[in-house]
A protein has these predicted regions:
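Conserved class I S-adenosyl-L-methionine
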Residues: 1-35, 47-48, 67-70, 158
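C-terminal alpha-helical "lid/dimerization" subdomain adjacent to the S-adenosyl-L-methionine
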Residues: 15-19, 137-189, 194-195
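Class I SAM-dependent methyltransferase SAM/SAH-binding core
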Residues: 39-93
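Short glycine-centered segments of the SAM/dcSAM-binding site in methyltransferase folds
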Residues: 57, 131-133
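A short acidic, Gly/Pro-enriched loop at the edge of an enzyme's catalytic core
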Residues: 89-105
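A short SAM/SAH-binding and catalytic strip from SAM-dependent methyltransferases
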Residues: 103-116
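A short glycine-rich, Lys/Arg-flanked "PGG" loop and its adjoining helix->strand segment in the class I
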Residues: 118-130
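C-terminal lobe and adjacent flexible extensions of AdoMet/dcAdoMet transferase-like proteins
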Residues: 196-201
């Protein structure tokens, strides 16, 4: 498995280059004005770093030791970003983050990879302040039945080569199930179906 993790990390930026160019303005819009205490879930290779406001206090977590090496190279010295080699469901985070303490939690192209993403969203909910917001940019399940069938067939293999990425998750439904309320949400397509938005408690 570590072979695929290492390969995925080494090729991630080049593989995602076209998609990330199309997402640049959306990432910037979602992130650049956020201030206060922020949790960046699954930093990957550090794509979000350039968009963080200089005054924000960012805790950025990434479970892949290969991804985090890429992310370290992108850490801007003028910003307050602390990077940790942790997953969101690791017990260490429970000691680092108090309930009702975060202003924002950012999940961009990461909920597809977290093994227990329902638990992750439950933790995010309890860590956010009553006025806190969840910021989302995720690919989700297909809308049409035949596309869902194809996703379900492909998913087991894709999950291996894609470092745990699931093509077919109902992330939009799970967010609402946890109790989040949308301030803004949008569905759109970039080959896959995507879901972005801002959610309160």
């Amino acid at each position: 498995m570590s072979f695929y993790q290492k390969l995925f990390a080494s090729k991630y930026d080049s593989f995602m280059k076209g998609i990330e160019i199309s997402f640049f303005d959306l990432r910037k819009e979602l992130i650049e004005n956020l201030e206060g205490k922020i949790l960046d879930v699954g930093s990957g290779t550090g794509v979000n770093f350039e968009h963080f406001h200089a005054s924000a206090e960012v805790i950025s977590i990434e479970p892949s030791k290969y991804m985090i090496e890429k992310a370290k190279a992108k850490l801007p010295s003028e910003k307050s970003i602390k990077l940790y080699n942790l997953g969101i469901n690791d017990s260490e985070l429970e000691y680092m983050i108090e309930d009702n303490s975060l202003d924002y939690v950012i999940c961009t192209l990461v909920l597809c990879t977290i093994p227990d993403y329902e638990l992750a969203l439950q933790k995010i909910y309890k860590w956010l302040k009553p006025t806190g917001k969840l910021i989302i940019l995720e690919h989700i399940h297909a809308e049409k039945k035949h596309r869902k069938i194809i996703q379900n067939i492909i998913n087991p293999v894709w999950k291996i080569v894609g470092d745990g990425c699931n093509l077919n998750r109902n992330t939009d439904e799970m967010i609402l199930k946890i109790g989040f309320k949308p301030d803004k949400e949008e569905y759109f397509k970039r080959t896959l179906r995507f879901y972005s938005g801002i959610f309160g408690k």
